[in-house]
């Protein structure tokens, strides 16, 4: 069936999908067509937000239906995600918010989101590769900087 997805900023696209398609799959198609990251999308049908895990047929969305797309600001998305899973895996959310604001000044919303996601993946990968020896070495440098300086000069106190 043919659907039209219209963003509040005026852009729109037509998509060919199955009636039993998942909303999450539709979001990926919208991302490809309108260049809006999936995590920033909120799709509405007749004023009701669509849940990713549900199917279009669950909302009685039929051929030639029109869906509205609300693009969530990147900062809001990061706050939502931060409260969910970043507390354990990543540093405190404020640093990612700050980085997000800096990126937003230099890139489009979509590009800033991609750069931030890649930066977070690289950061997580680097942290996961740290050994206990690496962590002990870092801790010693922070807790006893005078010893580290002496060792770098070639002698200990």
UniProtKB/Swiss-Prot annotation:
CDD domains: Ubl_UBL4A_like
GO molecular function annotation: protein-folding chaperone binding
Main location: cytoplasm
Nucleus recorded as keyword: yes
Keywords: Cytoplasm, Isopeptide bond, Nucleus, Phosphoprotein, Transport, Ubl conjugation
GO cellular component, one term: membrane
Region (Required and sufficient for interaction with BAG6): 96-138
PROSITE patterns recorded: UBIQUITIN_1, UBIQUITIN_2
Cross-link (Glycyl lysine isopeptide (Lys-Gly) (interchain with G-Cter in ubiquitin)): 48
The UniProt record lists the keyword Transit peptide: no
Residues covered by the Ubiquitin-like domain: 1-76
Entry's Gene Ontology BP terms: post-translational protein targeting to endoplasmic reticulum membrane; regulation of protein stability; tail-anchored membrane protein insertion into ER membrane; ubiquitin-dependent protein catabolic process
Modifications made to the protein after synthesis: Polyubiquitinated. Ubiquitination by AMFR and deubiquitination by USP13 may regulate the interaction between the BAG6/BAT3 complex and SGTA and therefore may regulate client proteins fate.
Subunit comment: Component of the BAG6/BAT3 complex, at least composed of BAG6, UBL4A and GET4/TRC35. Interacts with BAG6; the interaction is direct and required for UBL4A protein stability. Interacts with USP13; may be indirect via BAG6.
Role played: As part of a cytosolic protein quality control complex, the BAG6/BAT3 complex, maintains misfolded and hydrophobic patches-containing proteins in a soluble state and participates in their proper delivery to the endoplasmic reticulum or alternatively can promote their sorting to the proteasome where they undergo degradation. The BAG6/BAT3 complex is involved in the post-translational delivery of tail-anchored/type II transmembrane proteins to the endoplasmic reticulum membrane.
Protein name: Ubiquitin-like protein 4A
């Amino acid at each position: 069936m043919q659907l039209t997805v219209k963003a509040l900023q005026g852009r729109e696209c037509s998509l060919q999908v199955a009636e039993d398609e998942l909303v999450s799959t539709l979001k990926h198609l919208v991302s490809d067509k309108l260049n809006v990251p999936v995590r920033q999308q909120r799709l509405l049908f007749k004023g009701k937000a669509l849940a990713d895990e549900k199917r279009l047929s669950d909302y009685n969305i039929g051929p030639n239906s029109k869906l509205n797309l609300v693009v969530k600001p990147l900062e809001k998305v990061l706050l939502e995600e931060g409260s969910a899973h970043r507390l354990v895996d990543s540093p405190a959310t404020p640093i990612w918010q700050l980085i997000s604001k800096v990126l937003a000044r230099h890139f489009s919303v979509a590009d800033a989101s991609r750069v931030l996601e890649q930066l977070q993946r690289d950061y997580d990968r680097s942290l996961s590769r740290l050994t206990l020896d690496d962590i002990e070495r870092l801790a010693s440098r922070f807790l006893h900087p005078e010893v580290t300086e002496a060792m770098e000069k070639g002698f200990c106190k």
